[in-house]
């Protein structure tokens, strides 16, 4: 890949194609002291104030450093490498950690122990890598006093306050505004599907667990989605294309969002799942399409609730699950 100059034009040649770089693209990257703040790299001018009929009048190539002269009287120097790096960055997929599928046989997952100096340690790096691989990690020994979980959460990213506050105590209360405040057993689901955006990382922190039972159950939405895609492609297609309404209402707030049960990214790769049968409302569609949708929703519900995909264990005081 290289930069080529032909007459008063700049081209990028990637080996297969040779494309002219728009002169305005080059003009708005002017880096003179009166045009660009050297500290924060923010422009000191509005590029929309530049005449769009911009052209290059002269180009001098000084051993990989282009000295550009434009028809509006400005000129500056830019390295060929800067142009090449911008081109490469816009055509590369971001570095990702490969997802690992798991089911009920996944019972030897590593547990990480919280230490007071964990925040900038290799252990934290390993914890985050494991999180991205499997979608969850188990962390032990997290302090249970003074809402320490908030401090821990802020070490990963900014805590997002919701209508429930910075944190949510799962307990039974009278006149609850959410089923998590009741003793009702909850089947596998994703939390807060009615938010936009939905939670990125949630932290479940066990303060005490002295009851019989009280197990935590996890299901991998990625594994289930991929299985649906493999065995029932027509179900996968409709679950990833039909948006349903998720809704939460109490005395002070109404929260709604529309989303697919299997959400894909712009390249049609798996991004996330939303699943909360007590909160979702299908749209009005043709009967045949809804027939297929309801069959697909039942099938994915069967999978989420199947023992085949569940990992179940009991959290002890101080244990936490980022998920």
Regions picked out by a protein language model, each given a short descriptive name:
Residues 1-119:
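Motif-centric detector for short Cys/His coordination patterns
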Residues 93-136, 141-142, 146-317:
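Active-site environment of non-heme Fe oxygenases that use a 2-His-1-carboxylate facial triad
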Residues 323:
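Active-site pocket scaffolds in enzymes
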